[in-house]
Swiss-Prot record:
Localization terms from the record: Plastid, Chloroplast inner membrane
Main location per the UniProt record: plastid
Primary gene name: cemA
Function of the molecule: Contributes to K(+)/H(+) antiport activity by supporting proton efflux to control proton extrusion and homeostasis in chloroplasts in a light-dependent manner to modulate photosynthesis. Prevents excessive induction of non-photochemical quenching (NPQ) under continuous-light conditions. Indirectly promotes efficient inorganic carbon uptake into chloroplasts.
GO BP term (any one): potassium ion transport
Catalytic activity: K(+)(in) + H(+)(out) = K(+)(out) + H(+)(in)
Residue intervals passing through the bilayer: 6-26, 107-127, 152-172, 190-210
Species: Aethionema cordifolium (Lebanon stonecress)
HAMAP family in the record: CemA_PxcA
The protein's name in its UniProt record: Potassium/proton antiporter CemA
Amino acid sequence: MAKKKAFIPFLYFTSIVFFPWWISLCCNKSLKTWITNWWNTRQRETFLNEIQEKSLLEKFIQLEELFQLDEMIKEYPETDLQKFRLGIHKETIQFIKIHNEYRIHTIFNFSTNLISFVILSSYSFWGKEKLFILNSWVQEFLYNLSDTIKAFLILLLTDLCIGFHSPHGWELMIGYIYKDFGFAHYEQLLSGLVSTFPVILDTIFKYWIFRYLNRVSPSLVVIYHAIND
């Protein structure tokens, strides 16, 4: 009976880990079709951010240059000009299709993440007791570790998150999240987040060491600073 009670929180934690994948799989089969039909049949307004407007403008400038080139080579045979105009027409249609698919992908990703957040929040709320049990297990495990191991783990975690090489990792992680939500790549915003987020984490961590660890385990703080130096 005790083993069964201990197994239930572990099963609950496993379900939380795999829940987002399951939700994404279900939404991919049902929600994507509905969003595609809604976008193609009912949506009439075009909403673009600054980056997408710039991309569209660049594409149409390229097409305009092609049309100007078309005017400059009118001395060529009519059959060649028709083929040239047909090629431009096909490129325009292809560009519109790509843009349409991108908008559908953006709406789908954002909707899927929002649904996943709502479901996981509700699931976590109704399973608070199991989360409390898991939290007690983690605290007991950490409490049984020696101060040297604790200091080593803290140092390893901080070096991974806010160390010298961490900006590249944050760039990959934030870029993946940004892309997963379907947003366009914005280099300036990405650089700003990468340069400020680790600094904020570093400040919070140092405050945590100062307020919490100094009170709970002063020896751990001494070992941590000794290893860090």
